[in-house]
Amino acid sequence: MKSKIWVIFIILFISVMSVNQANEFNHKTKRVPAEWEPQEATWMQWPGYWEKDNEIAFAKIADIISRYQKLHILFHSDQIYVDAHKALNDIGVDPQGKNIRWHAVPYDNSWMRDNGPVYVLNDDEIRIQNWNFNAWGGAFGPDIPFNLDNSVPDKVGTILDIPVDHIDIVHERGNLEFNGSDTVILNWSTIGDPNRNLNYNKKQAEHDLKEYFGVKQVIFIEGIPDGDLTKGHIDGIARFIGPRTVVVLQCTSRSLCRPDSKDAEIYNKAAKIIEKAGFNVIREPIEGFVNHKDLMFDTNYMNWLVGNGFVIVPGFGNPKTDIMAKSRIENYFPDRDVYLIEMLSSWSAGGGVHCHTNDQPAFSVSN
C-alpha cells in the first residue's frame, strides 16, 4: 500500500514539475526584442497640416533610415502624400526609393511611437499588440482627436498579415524600455495616471506587464519632469543600451533643472531604483538649455532612435551641446553611425525622433 502511495506521489510530483517547466518555457519564449536587435523596418506617420513644422525633420529622418533599412510611411490624405514627396525631393531623396513604402492609412497625429504597434514574439510567432490610446490621458486638451490613431496597429497588422491582440489598458510604447530578455522599465506616473487607467494599481500592472510581455522583472520609476505632458515617458528619462546597462538622465549646474531640483530628484531616484534592480547605470548629463519660440527647455538627448547600423538623435541647434552629446552616444553605440537632426519644433511639442518612429523587429514578415 505504501509503495502505491509513493508511486502516486512521484507521478503527481513529475506532473507538477512538467507543468511548471512548460509554463517557464512559455514564459521564456514570449518577449519583446530590444531596440538594438536586428530590425525589419521603421514606421512613421507623416505630419499633417497642424504639425507642418516637423516636416523638414521628418524628411531628414526618412533619408537616414532608408539608407539602412526599410521605411514604411503612412499618409492620410492625397495632400499629405504630395507634401511628403516634395519634402523628400527637396533634400535629394527619391520618395520611391527601394527601401521606402507608402500606405494610405487614416491617423490623427505624427507620434507613431505612442499609438503604433508593440511587437511581441510568442512561441516563434510574431504578434502585434494594440494597447488603448487616448492622446496621453487628454493632456493636450479635449479637442485632440485620437480614435484614428487607436486603429493604426490593426491597419499595420493587415498590411503585414500579422495577428493583432487588443489590450484593454491605456498606455503608450514611448513608456516602455525593454532589454530584450527579462526586464521592462517604465514610469508608473504614466501607466498609473487616472486619466489613462482609473483605479489601476502597481500590483495589477506588474501582473499584466509580465503576462503580456513575458518579462520576469518590471521596474517602475516615478515622477513627472517639469513640463512633460506625457507624464514622464521613460524614453526621455532612462534607456537601455545593452542587456544589463541603462543610461539615465542627470541634471547639472548648466541645465534648467538644477542638481537640487524636483526633476533632479526624479532622475536620481530612477538611477538608484534601476541600479538596485541589478543593472549598470550610466548618467547622461544635461549640458545646457535652449530658447525656441519663447519656450526654454533643457538639451535632453535621450530620445534617440536605434536601427540597423545607425542611431538618430534629436539635436537642439546648440553646436557645443550637440557635439558633446554625439560623442557620448557614439560611445554608447560604438558599432553604429550616429546622426543628429535639429528637432526643436518637435521637442517644443513634447518629443523627438524616438517619439515619431516605431521600429519593427526583424523576426516579423514584411510585405
Residue map of PLM features:
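Positively charged n-region of N-terminal signal peptides that target proteins for export
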Residues: M1-I5
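Bacterial N-terminal signal peptides
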Residues: I8-V16
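Sec/Tat signal peptide C-region and signal peptidase I cleavage site
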Residues: V19-Q21
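The feature marks the mature, well-folded catalytic cores of soluble enzymes
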Residues: N23-N367
